[in-house]
Amino acid sequence: MKKRFLALLLSVCIGVSMLVLPASAAGSNTAVQTAVTLGAFSTEEAAGLSTPLTRGQLAKLLVAFSAYHDNANTQGSIGTLYTDVNGSSAYAPYIRIAVQQGWMSGYTDGSFRPDQTVTLEEACTAALTLLGYDVTTLTGGFPAAQLNKANAIGLRANLSRTQGQAMTMEDGAILLYNALTANTASGSV
């Protein structure tokens, strides 16, 4: 009888502890777990979610959450992509795909700057292009047009960043997770 009571008490404690989890934490956790499952984050990277999101990491996130996620492993090491990204870089296949698909681009000086921190508007612009939106045809100027469109289709749900603020790894996972259920430019999900 005592064992049954303890088992019941234990199951009630576990059940109650699950109810205390805030909704935002659950959503964030789901986004991060999805990023890990898709290969966008290693388990070590998932442990450092508050670290700034870089352009190289954003390229990896974009590819992982796209139909091209299997192509990254077949890219191989093909020469120098940019002056600061050689073909053997861990981010090289992801950067190559992200640039080829038009989701991201390099700079006029021939660099990509894979270690540069990404701002909210840069990440939203990349996510919108991933979804097929032509960001040059949005109403308004950069970055307001991109941020407004991202907000309208739900990309910014559960993100507290504002214009000009740096994104974290967790923010990047949430943004791309939101892209999974956002309408594409053609109107489909």
Spans of model-derived segments:
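Feature responds to low-complexity, polar/acidic, surface-exposed segments characteristic
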Residues: 2-31, 36-92, 100-121, 127-166, ...
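Surface-exposed binding/hinge segments that line
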Residues: 170, 175
